[in-house]
Amino acid sequence: MIKKLLFLILVFIMVFFISPLVFSQEIPLVLPKITIEAGEASQPQELVLSLQILLLLTILSLAPAILIMVTSFTRIVVVLGFVRNALGSPQIPPTAVVIGLSLFLTFFIMAPTFSQIQDNALSPYLAGSITQEEAMHRGVNSLRDFMFRQTQEKDLALLVSFANLPRPQMRDDIPTHVLIPAFILSELRAAFTLGFLIYIPFLVIDMVVASILMSMGMMMLPPVMISLPFKLLLFVLVDGWDLITRGLTLSFR
């Protein structure tokens, strides 16, 4: 079931990769009419088709959550949230900007994996050279390879022990439903590590400003208000956004 969910999400993600090719060939597109009616089914296949449509609609509603769980989005958005809080401006950049930047960085970082899925799974499936099951297997394996590279062994060992599974000898012995939460734990650990490194210089500025204000007897003046311009100045002088983007990108290699 998890493999089918991941494959269907990958199909929708890869649409923008193949849409230029489709429109350049001027192939007439036939739009299907999908309806769900409450009535008596004359054949078992009609009930199965209706259930498949309902399952597809459910998958579409869960697509954002699945995208977050199996890609680099979690680490990126958490780190950018730490940047906002470390600067002392929780509302700037706005949440919409943070989410948008996280999505585009996710597509950039995941581009090799998506290209591999398109070449090995989606394109052969659309050409009719492989079956749906084989395409799902290849697509999920590409995502599993990415998640294995970013997952720490202790997180995998923790989830394997919770699942009461025997000690795996190969990667194929680890189920996808065990790999995904282990991957998320590793992503959160990496994001919090980067967040700690981001906080250190801004914390030093806060301590220096607070000490100066106390020595001048200005204890009623909020240190955060005074330190914010200095934090912004430091962030601009060191080209903070370039450093953050570079660090996030290199952390996945």
Name these PLM-found stretches.
Residues 2, 23-253:
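Hydrophobic alpha-helical segments and their helix-loop boundaries in membrane
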Residues 1-25:
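N-terminal secretory/membrane targeting signals
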